[in-house]
């Protein structure tokens, strides 16, 4: 699912590295917290993976961006976890 959301960058976390136990391949991600400027619980955590992590270098705190995202869920132990993955950004202010 491709969606566009607009928000103000509030926090850019450090890049995290994970290793797949089976394949021993490394996986990188960076989480960015944005505020959608709505009244109730408007904070949202967006993830940047692998090659898209470089996009976070263009982000500036307290600036407004348009984020092109894909949302997906994965099941693990009868629980579902949702990811919001960003693949394109555009500065609006």
Walk through the language-model features, giving the residues of each.
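Single-stranded nucleic acid-binding surfaces, predominantly the OB-fold ssDNA-binding core
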Residues: 1-93
């Amino acid at each position: 699912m491709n969606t566009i959301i607009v928000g103000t960058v509030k926090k850019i976390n450090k890049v995290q590295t994970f290793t797949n136990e089976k394949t021993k391949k490394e996986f990188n991600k960076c989480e960015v917290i944005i505020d959608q400027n709505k009244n109730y619980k408007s904070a949202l955590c967006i993830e940047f993976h692998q090659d898209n992590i470089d996009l976070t270098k263009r982000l500036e705190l307290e600036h407004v961006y348009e984020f092109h995202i894909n949302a997906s869920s994965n099941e693990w132990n009868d629980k579902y976890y949702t990811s919001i993955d960003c693949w394109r950004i555009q500065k609006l202010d």
